[in-house]
Design a protein with these regions (language model features):
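Short, charged, amphipathic alpha-helix that recurs within catalytic cores of restriction-modification
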Residues: 78-117
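Domain-level recognition of nuclease-like catalytic cores that cleave nucleotide substrates
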Residues: 3, 101, 106-175
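Hydrophobic alpha-helical segments, chiefly the membrane-spanning helices
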Residues: 205-206
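Residues immediately flanking
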Residues: 75
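Polar low-complexity intrinsically disordered regions
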Residues: 175-180, 184
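Active-site beta-strand-loop-beta-strand hairpin of nuclease catalytic cores
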Residues: 55-56, 60-72
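Conserved small/polar residues in nucleotide/adenosyl-binding loops
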Residues: 193-200
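Acidic-basic catalytic patches of nuclease active cores, encompassing PD-(D/E)XK
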Residues: 1-53
Length: 206
């Protein structure tokens, strides 16, 4: 990917590692809600390792680890919303899938669209078999790489999960894979709802 690609790898690595400066940099043109969701990673950061071989052996460009969660991540960037995989890039995809199947990992693609305001990163998963635990639950909420009319996987920025939503998903305190769309809008709403439920149960007991 060259020096530009390496810069984007460092950008994503800084975010996943929970560095406040890095999160602020990628969310400076995002909404306050999006920024708040992304900032959750500062409380539950990943250990992020730059993988050797630039993803050619199924490790991806980055390896993000935390507890029982591990993501090999292949980083791509382009000025185009769609990126088709062929030759070496298709071999990288197949290697990621093979490692995911053999090791029970969930490989991801992180796609950076150049020249766009707001959240410029999108996350997509590589379809693998045999996932268990938290990875299996998380996998249900992360979109897969879309398919061409010939059934071949490719990258489509519009069909990926925004990075801030991904961070909010994987940084939930319980680690469950509930969709980000189902998150409560605010802590106050949750407290009020729980309080009303508690009051109702007391009335029923009485």
């Amino acid at each position: 990917m060259g020096s530009i690609g390496s810069a984007y790898e460092r950008e994503l690595r800084s975010v996943l590692a929970g560095e406040i400066k890095g999160v602020r940099a990628v969310t400076k043109s995002c909404s306050e809600i999006e920024r708040t969701q992304a900032m959750k990673v500062t409380n539950r950061p990943f250990l992020v390792v730059r993988a050797p071989g630039s993803g050619s052996e199924g490790t991806g460009d980055l390896l993000a680890l935390r507890g029982d969660i591990c993501f090999p991540i292949e980083v791509k960037s382009s000025k185009s919303k769609k990126l088709y995989l062929s030759g070496r890039t298709f071999d990288q995809l197949e290697a990621l899938r093979d490692v995911g199947n053999r090791c029970g990992l969930l490989p991801l693609y992180a796609y950076r669209l150049k020249g766009v305001r707001g959240d410029s990163w999108r996350i997509m998963k590589v379809e693998v078999k045999g996932l268990s635990g938290k990875l299996r639950h998380l996998s249900r909420s992360i979109p897969s790489l879309p398919l061409t009319r010939n059934g071949k996987e490719y990258l489509d920025w519009d069909k990926g999960m925004p990075l801030h939503r991904f961070l909010s998903l994987v940084c939930r305190s319980d680690g469950a894979g509930t969709s980000v769309d189902s998150f409560p809008s605010s802590p106050i709403t949750v407290s009020y709802t729980h309080l009303r439920a508690h009051e109702t149960s007391l009335h029923l007991v009485c």
